[in-house]
Amino acid sequence: MKALDKETAIARMNTFGRNGTPFLFVIDYMQEHSYVEPLDGIDTSVCLYQFRGTGNAPDAGARYAGTIDWEFTPPAPADYRRSFNTVRRNLLGGNSYLTNLTCKVPLRTNLTLKDVFLHSHALYKLWLKDRFVCFSPEIFVRMEEGRIKSFPMKGTIDATLPHAESILLDDAKEAAEHATIVDLIRNDLSMVSEHVTVASYRYIDRLQTNKGPILQTSSEICGMLPGDYTKRLGDILFSLLPAGSITGAPKPRTMQIIAEAEGYERGFYTGVMGCYADGRLDSAVMIRFIEQEDGQLYFKAGGGITAQSRWESEYNEVIQKIYVPIY
């Protein structure tokens, strides 16, 4: 698989869509490196994918028979607070209303990247040999029959807590964060479609993990695409990037704040992955992500920060998200 620059990736997606060629796409956070490959040309020794039960790895999701060793080194609280304060200063200064702050966390486990792919349970999974594995629960956009839909996911809580669902839905900070991202995604979809509406607001998803169940809130936003959209799949998708749920609002200024606060390169983490086949485009945000660098594994995780956020709660949410859905 050959990495492509932005312009080449857009043109390739447009061509495949125009010709009705089924293809896989993987796009990094900054849209500087992308893979766009016809499905029948993917080498399974290098790349495996499974998106909502469809892919090139029929054994994906098989039960893991062994014991999982899982240790990680979270950021020092002082380091996280320093990054948090950079974000908060900009929030209070009016430069952003919502900023997604993420971390790069060293991980030690007996699982290989391929093990995680084969045995994890997630809506969207991708493995690139010796690079990374992603097991994402978050849909980015779907395009089908002239409609585009997006499903931003914001708000997380331990499902074992008493009254967890009510606590999550009643949390003022989580509600404000979710409202902001829904408004951002609605505006994004309005750039490429018409008659944009919020079809469902703050519904609850339950996710199983190796550390226990969690609850997350999502919304569904829909719009009507132009008649020639299959000929412009690359143009449409790239115009929506990076995903609003993993940047914030307003997007351009917030990305500058992220670069200042995080101090590392996200790479493919928080990019998007997906495929196009039979007239349908399906994609996911690349969250829940383990990367391999020089033999060391890193779990990348984060969450949305608003002016109402407390650093301790956000720090604990990052730790809560460092899991694998193997059970």
Show the residue positions of the predicted features.
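Extended alpha-helical targeting/anchoring segments
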Residues: M1-Y327
